[in-house]
Amino acid sequence: ERNADNLKKYKAICRQHIYKNMKGMYRQPVGALKYPFLVPGSGQYANQLWDWDSWLSDIALRQIIVENGTSDDREELIAYEKGCILNFLSYGGGDGWIPICIFDNTEERWQLLQKINPWKTNMHKPVLAQHAAFVVEQTGGDAEWLREGFYNLQTFVGKYLNYHRHKATGLLYWENDEMTRVPSTVFTEARAPSSSMP
């Protein structure tokens, strides 16, 4: 039954479960993923780094740590937060394309680019720079860890602003609905290229 008492009870149960299992979202470097990283917590994502899943998982973990964490928990999380971004930036380049996801067995960037057109293939959502800014803020303004990959972050943002932005509205868009996890519906199946909004 949906009532205030049950809501309170189930919220407490959910929070306790999350507090107990939060470090199950942490992953060590493996294969193509050279840095520690975060996953949403499901076994389906064992060694997969996804664009906005890592960002939103990080925000959730930060909230969990604010509510129930220690200074050691905060310090430990930093490597995983940074690693999400650094793993993605390691797949960047001058054209600005960065993949939506990286698996432990993802080929090297040059191999991926032989199979796709980076100008017509979806890439990481525009939240990559936002995620980096979030981590910089959480670490007291330290951005030195971004130095090596910063060019790739700049070209990534530039690609969205120059090639994936609707001129009339200024809204950023995806090239298509591939890997956006939008259910296949009449609204997506016949959508024109370059018209899906992130």
Predicted regions and their residues:
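A short secondary-structure junction motif
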Residues: 21, 25, 91-98, 105
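Extended, well-ordered alpha-helical scaffold segments
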Residues: 6-17, 70-89, 142-161
